[in-house]
From Swiss-Prot:
A zinc finger (C4-type) spans 37-59. GO terms for biological process: cytoplasmic translation; ribosomal small subunit assembly; ribosomal small subunit biogenesis; rRNA processing; translation. Binds 1 zinc ion per subunit. GO terms for molecular function: DNA binding; RNA binding; structural constituent of ribosome; zinc ion binding. One of its GO terms (cellular component) is postsynaptic density. InterPro entries: Ribosomal_eS27 (IPR000592), Ribosomal_eS27_Zn-bd_dom_sf (IPR023407), Ribosomal_zn-bd (IPR011332). Its cofactor is Zn(2+). Keywords: Cytoplasm, Diamond-Blackfan anemia, Metal-binding, Nucleus, Phosphoprotein, Ribonucleoprotein, Ribosomal protein, Zinc, Zinc-finger. This is Small ribosomal subunit protein eS27.
């Protein structure tokens, strides 16, 4: 284990584990995602840390439930993280 550590060039894995405010460049942990309904295959945009129950527009199926942090997706729902 080396005693000298490069603070200006941390590894991406190490940087991702840090708190969002203590990173070299601050970035949020939250993101938007496209969630596909398992029943009608419609795509809905959902926030990763949603605080309310999100329903499908087409068939009113519950897509995700809020928890203390990230929203929990319902079984069978597939998602894709949106690019900014």
């Amino acid at each position: 284990m080396p005693l000298a550590k490069d603070l200006l060039h941390p590894s991406p894995e190490e940087e991702k584990r840090k708190h969002k405010k203590k990173r070299l460049v601050q970035s949020p942990n939250s993101y938007f995602m496209d969630v596909k309904c398992p029943g009608c295959y419609k795509i809905t945009t959902v926030f990763s840390h949603a605080q309310t129950v999100v329903l499908c527009v087409g068939c009113s199926t519950v897509l995700c439930q809020p928890t203390g942090g990230k929203a929990r997706l319902t079984e069978g729902c597939s998602f894709r993280r949106k690019q900014h």
